[in-house]
Curated annotation (Swiss-Prot):
The chain crosses the membrane at residues 34-54, 233-253, 257-277, 316-336, 365-385, 455-477, 505-525, 564-584, 600-620, 639-659. The keyword Phosphoprotein applies. Glycosylated, glycosylation differs from tissue to tissue. The molecular mass of the mature glycosylated protein is highest in kidney, followed by lung, colon and spleen, then brain and tongue. Signal peptide: none annotated. This is Choline transporter-like protein 2. It comes from the Eukaryota. It catalyses: choline(out) + n H(+)(in) = choline(in) + n H(+)(out); ethanolamine(out) + n H(+)(in) = ethanolamine(in) + n H(+)(out). GO terms for cellular component: mitochondrial outer membrane; plasma membrane. It is a multi-pass membrane protein.
């Protein structure tokens, strides 16, 4: 038996030995992993430099405003096109050219206009009539009516024809509609191409479709943005409700941990049960309605997601998912009912610890603020980098011109000899790009931007974990709680983390950031290789993605426990990670059961809060609450604010529960160390509370004798 124990501990390190001077987090400590601290500082300096360069070269207007053939923005204030917000295509049919999909730009002249055409006219019919005054606004700026029709069309100064159009994403598209199954523009089923020939409306449809493919995503984004502008204050109210519920739940958990856990379990089951009932009622209501039996596969992807809610198959899928989730939760509760009692006791102990360090509940706000700074800097830098390309002009022509698609300068092109080879060619804005060293390095800068975001975000999270671990470890290792605790345990732990362990936090977050950026690159490669038919490559990609996902989860778990050891002992990252890993391996059964059951209970708490707020948001934004039915704003997609509230509620609940989670993990690790260091004798008494000692049938002999 002794040999087996020796071999076991040899594999997983040696147990902690009794140290009479150890009274909790060590105060006399030195700086750890200084090299990583210096590396983080240099990386931040480089990140700031990248941001400055991006802000110098970038121009977000390229994303906001459409651009005409001269590379000028439509509708931008302070420019000559300030009163011309719409982009007009001379010949929308040419947008059906494959060049559109290659360079995302139609090979036809484009100008900024005040309004889209509202009537059908051709240059031939409008010339020398009163209609030409209206027609001229769709010609190039500075147009002089001193040429013949042929010369005007050859030089691309006016469109051959204008058709009734409607603005979409600040672009003018033909107002095509169907009347009794026949496509029409205005009252016409055909249109004149401006050269005396009549063509079918379907040609316009093809051109509009190709141009519209580029804009579908932007249109969806604009509609989502509109929904946010009219519902943002209701979203904030929903998030405030989630915050109040989370805080109320935490406060109640402080005093009624056992009852609250069981109430939480019952409420989650009831919420899921109501979800199943609601899905069944919607499924039954749609029975017999026209179009409700269409399958999701036949329908395909639709930008208007409300279409899916009119399908019976959608509600059937929701009902099956919720039913499976309900059954899984009930089975877990049945088989883990005894372990749940132990987890409740651990939560009660965590409640006492949080009660003595109440300011810890506010620390997630600090983490949230720092993460918002990281996200804002990353997003703005990413936008400026993506818009720091310069305008690229290329030769466009309807004939087989040898200069076709070659780069040109619009100011000098008409004067150069090359233009004589193709008299009808035009030098037109194509896209934003560049061939300088800076432009070639843009992809690398974007990768660096993403990597630094992961590194800094993980560093912020690590700082919060070390701070909370130090505060709660001070509680556990106080023999007389709370008399032996320091005056300000949270601030003391925060100061120690920044002063001594910035390098260790940078080291741990760097390892995690490397794995995360590799996962992002794998996702990028997977998207690029989706069209490939090589099954081995697909299999290899799936394996790599799975392996790195597991690796990320393991590193997060190891880092979390390493940070607890850093907060207690002040050792470097590698030593702390090794000691934490061996300590957990020596108590693997307790780790697998107690810790994970507690995590499961916290997850149920998050689901209860998110489910409650989500159901309330659903009924409000779908105008199903009669008292406030007229208050809810009209929306393009009511799922936009609902999903935002649900995701935001989860993040808020996660922020509050993360304090409890870190407290439980810290107390659990301290408890394992306590069992190894001490034996309950008068010389080596346990530091754990009387509740935990009773739960585990442990006693201090001195207390037992008295």
């Amino acid at each position: 038996m002794g040999k087996d124990s020796q071999n076991y501990y040899g594999k997983h390190g040696t147990p902690q030995k009794y140290d009479p001077t150890f009274k909790g987090p060590i105060y006399n400590r030195g700086c750890t992993d200084v090299i990583c601290c210096v590396l983080l500082f240099l990386a931040i300096v480089g990140y700031v430099a990248v941001g400055i360069i991006a802000w110098t070269h970038g121009d977000p207007r390229k994303v906001i405003y459409p651009t005409d053939s001269r590379g000028e923005f439509c509708g931008q204030k302070g420019t000559k096109n300030a009163d011309k917000p719409f982009l007009f295509y001379f010949n929308i049919v040419k947008c059906a050219n494959p060049l559109v999909l290659l360079e995302f730009h139609c090979p036809t002249p484009q100008i900024c206009v005040k309004q889209c055409p509202d009537r059908y006219l051709t240059l031939l019919s409008a010339r020398n009539t009163r209609d030409f005054d209206y027609y001229k606004q769709f010609c190039v700026p500075g147009f002089q009516n001193n040429k013949g029709v042929t010369e005007i069309l050859r030089d691309g100064e006016c469109p051959a024809v204008i058709t009734p159009s409607k603005p979409l994403a600040q672009r003018c598209f033909p107002a095509i509609h169907a009347s009794k199954g026949v496509l029409m523009v205005g009252n016409e089923t055909t249109y004149e191409d401006g050269h005396g020939a009549r063509k079918n409306i379907t040609d316009l449809v093809e051109g509009a479709k190709k141009a519209n493919k580029i804009l579908e995503a932007r249109q969806l984004a604009m509609q989502i943005f509109e929904d946010y502008t009219v519902s943002w204050y209701w979203i904030i109210i929903g998030l405030v409700i989630a915050m109040v519920l989370s805080l109320l739940f935490i406060v109640l958990l402080r005093f009624l941990a056992g009852i609250m856990v069981w109430v939480m379990i019952v409420m989650v089951i009831l919420v899921l049960g109501y979800g199943i009932f609601h899905c069944y009622m919607e499924y039954s209501r749609l029975r017999g309605e026209a179009g409700s039996d269409v399958s999701l596969v036949d329908l395909g992807f639709q930008t208007d997601l409300r279409v899916y809610l009119h399908l019976r198959q959608t509600w059937m899928a929701f009902m099956i998912i919720l039913s499976i989730l309900e059954v899984v939760i009930i089975l877990l509760l049945i088989f883990l009912r005894k372990r749940i009692l132990i987890a409740i006791a651990l939560i009660k102990e965590a409640s006492r610890a949080v009660g003595h360090v109440m300011c810890s509940l506010l620390y997630p706000l600090v983490t949230f603020f720092l993460l918002c700074l990281c996200i804002a800097y990353w997003a703005s830098t990413s936008v400026f980098l993506s818009t720091s390309n310069t305008a690229v002009y290329k030769v466009v022509d309807d004939t087989a011109c040898p200069l076709l698609r070659k780069t040109c300068n619009p100011e000098t092109f008409p004067l150069r000899n090359e233009s004589l080879q193709c008299p009808t060619a035009r030098c037109q804005f194509a896209f934003y790009g560049g061939e300088s060293t800076y432009h070639r390095a843009l992809l690398g800068l974007q990768i660096f931007n993403a990597f630094m975001f992961f590194w800094l975000a993980n560093f912020v999270l690590a700082l919060g974990q070390v701070t909370l671990a130090g505060a709660f470890a001070s509680y556990y290792w106080a023999m007389r709680k709370p008399d032996d605790m320091p005056a300000f345990p949270l601030f003391s732990a925060f100061g120690r983390a920044l002063r001594y362990h910035t390098g260790s936090l940078a080291f741990g977050s760097l390892i995690l950031a490397i794995v995360q950026i590799i996962r992002v690159m794998l996702e990028y490669l997977d998207q690029r290789l989706k069209a490939a038919q090589n099954k081995f490559a697909k299999f290899l990609m799936v394996c790599l993605k799975c392996c790195f996902w597991c690796l990320e989860k393991f590193i997060k778990f190891l880092n979390r426990n390493a940070y607890i050891m850093i907060a207690i002992y002040g050792t470097n990252f590698c030593t702390s990670a090794r000691n934490a890993f061996f300590l957990l391996m020596r108590n693997i059964i307790r780790v697998a059961v107690l810790d994970k059951v507690t995590d499961f209970l916290f997850l149920l708490g998050k689901l209860l809060i998110v489910g409650s707020v989500g159901i309330l948001a659903f009924f409000f934004f779908t105008h199903r609450i009669r008292i406030v039915q007229d208050t809810a704003p009209p929306l393009n997609y009511y799922w936009v604010p609902i999903l935002t509230v649900i995701i935001g509620s989860y993040l808020i609940a996660h922020g509050f529960f993360s304090v409890y989670g870190m407290c439980v993990d810290t107390l659990f690790l301290c408890f394992l160390e306590d069992l190894e260091r001490n034996d309950g004798s008068a010389e080596r008494p346990y530091f754990m509370s009387s509740t935990l000692k009773k739960l585990l049938n442990k006693t201090n002999k001195k207390v037992a004798e008295s």
